[in-house]
Amino acid sequence: MSIGTAVRTVLAQYATFSGRARRSEYWWWSLAYSIVFAVLYVLAIALVGVEAFTNPEAAAPGAGGIGGLLVFGLIFVFVLGTFLPSLAVTIRRLHDTGRSGWWYLISLVPFGNIVLLVFAFGDSTPGSNAYGPNPKGEGGYSGQGYGAPQQYGTPQQYGTPQ
């Protein structure tokens, strides 16, 4: 699964808390989310810094310029708009490892995010589980490049004359 496919899948299942999400879907979504958030944040800090440098009154605490405020507003809209998909893909990822979505609440206690991170790195439950069929397929991932090696034609015999 590519990063674009993962983002489209997560956004298409905006508030779908049932089913399972593969590791790749979860981590590609997390990477895309982090990149967009970081770019917006750096842009906001840069705009606030430029305005504070060019306008000394804007450097006073609480007197941020309009550009930085607009970008911080955009960050707020981004975080608000992606909260449900992020929550949903995390719960589906927990389902894929055979755990209830209620395990997400462990992130509310100190160091609970570490436990959630370990769960997110975990492998899928083989076959179907209580939350649905394995998104990798019944026997694991069977895409090109994975699985048992395939032999095409007859092996070449090196060193023997033909």
Stretch-by-stretch model annotation:
Residues 37-83, 162:
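Membrane-helix interface segments in multi-pass membrane proteins
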Residues 25, 44-45, 57, 112, ...:
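Residue-level signal for alpha-helical context at structural boundaries
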Residues 1-32, 88-102, 118-162:
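Membrane-interface extramembranous regions at the lipid-water interface
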Residues 36-41, 111, 115:
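Alpha-helical transmembrane segments of multipass membrane proteins
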Residues 1-5, 63-88, 97-122:
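Selective recognition of hydrophobic, aromatic-rich stretches within alpha-helical transmembrane segments
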Residues 44, 48-52, 110-111, 121-124:
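Short helix-capping/hinge motifs at transmembrane helix termini and TM-loop junctions
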